[in-house]
Swiss-Prot record:
It comes from Bordetella petrii (strain ATCC BAA-461 / DSM 12804 / CCUG 43448). It comes from the Bacteria. The lineage of its organism: Bacteria, Pseudomonadati, Pseudomonadota, Betaproteobacteria, Burkholderiales. Belongs to the UPF0391 family. Pfam families: DUF1328. It is found in: Cell membrane. The chain crosses the membrane at residues 5-25, 27-47. This is UPF0391 membrane protein Bpet1858.
Length: 54
């Protein structure tokens, strides 16, 4: 039981360092860009599939 407590404590410390540091803002910016890229790719895939069936 103590082993799991130490493991979760270490994970919490790592998450705090990454979250409270400047890495979170940079990752959020990259995530926004990737969201729009994959949204466009999904729409293109749906449209090409719709036109291919006709």
């Amino acid at each position: 039981m103590l082993y799991y407590a130490v493991v979760f404590f270490v994970i919490a410390i790592i998450a705090a360092v990454l979250g409270f540091g400047g890495i979170a803002a940079g990752a959020a910016g990259i995530a926004k860009i990737l969201f729009f890229v994959f949204l466009i790719l999904a729409l293109l895939s749906i449209l090409s599939g719709a036109f291919r069936k006709k």
